């Protein structure tokens, strides 16, 4: 078998899930003359129909992308301890990669709150993704710690509606407004569990190729940047239809 034909057959085999195109009669059952004839036939066909190779490579790329997305979503859905708002048993989950210093995150805050108010079958999980500065890290730690006390929704509203730069003082003010035990909150902020949850979010973002905020994931749709409520509604409707 020529190197050209062998390379093409390997591509086709990988692209179609390991079902080898070459599972013709066993090699031992084919004589040299027949083998040469088959090689020439394959090579002539492939050269005359190069789109076959292209389609095979596209199929392979899609399979690899689908597998990568499945693995990334598995990491994303591991959300124990992540802050959330809404019905804990909702069938639709919106994951938001967010940073409290992100202006675009504040822009998407209002439509998300409106969506939660109008649809009680939606849950918003905040994937705390502090990427802008040290204060972002402190705010993310406080958000996860606020979730542990059951006061995250009010903390989140206070943080998103506050004016001015995020500082430790503004974080503690938001936590106090939400009714948090501040001593416990500060202790939890530095805990290994909170660090693990934030690191888990970083891993999910890397797998999903999310490098900025906000980043939304609804079903299998990854949406970079801020989007309006109408687009969110459309994606949710499509996700519900897909889920049956």
Q: Which stretches of residues belong to each language-model region?
A:
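N-terminal targeting signals for export/organelle localization
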Residues: 2-6, 10-74
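C-terminal cap of thioredoxin/glutaredoxin-like
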Residues: 5-7, 24, 28-35, 39-45, ...
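Beta-strand elements within well-structured catalytic alpha/beta cores of enzymes
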Residues: 38, 93-94
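Residue-level signal for pocket-adjacent positions within structured domains
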Residues: 71, 79-80, 218
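A short beta-strand-turn-helix
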Residues: 75-92, 116-117
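Structural alpha/beta surface segment adjacent to cysteine/selenocysteine redox centers
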Residues: 95, 100-101, 106-176, 180-181, ...
């Amino acid at each position: 078998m020529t190197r050209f034909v062998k390379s093409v057959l390997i591509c086709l085999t990988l692209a179609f899930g390991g079902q080898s195109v070459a599972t013709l009669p066993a090699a031992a059952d084919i004589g040299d003359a027949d083998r040469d004839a088959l090689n020439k036939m394959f090579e002539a066909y492939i050269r005359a129909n190069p789109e076959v190779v292209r389609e095979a490579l596209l199929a392979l790329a899609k399979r690899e992308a689908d597998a990568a997305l499945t693995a990334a979503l598995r990491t994303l859905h591991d959300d124990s301890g992540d802050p959330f708002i809404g019905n804990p048993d909702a069938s639709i989950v919106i994951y938001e990669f967010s940073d409290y210093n992100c202006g675009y995150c504040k822009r998407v805050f209002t439509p998300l709150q409106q969506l939660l108010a109008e649809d009680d079958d939606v849950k918003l999980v905040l994937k705390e993704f502090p990427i802008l500065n040290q204060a972002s890290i402190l705010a993310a730690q406080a958000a996860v710690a606020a979730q542990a006390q059951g006061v995250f929704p009010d903390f989140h509203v206070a943080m998103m509606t506050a004016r001015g730069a995020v500082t430790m003082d503004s974080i503690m003010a938001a936590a106090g407004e939400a009714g948090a035990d501040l001593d416990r909150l500060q202790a939890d902020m530095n805990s290994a569990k909170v660090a693990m949850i934030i690191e888990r979010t970083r891993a999910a973002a890397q797998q999903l190729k999310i490098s900025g905020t906000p980043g939304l994931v609804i079903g299998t749709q990854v949406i970079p940047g801020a989007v309006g409520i109408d687009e969110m509604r459309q994606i949710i409707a499509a996700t519900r239809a897909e889920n049956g």
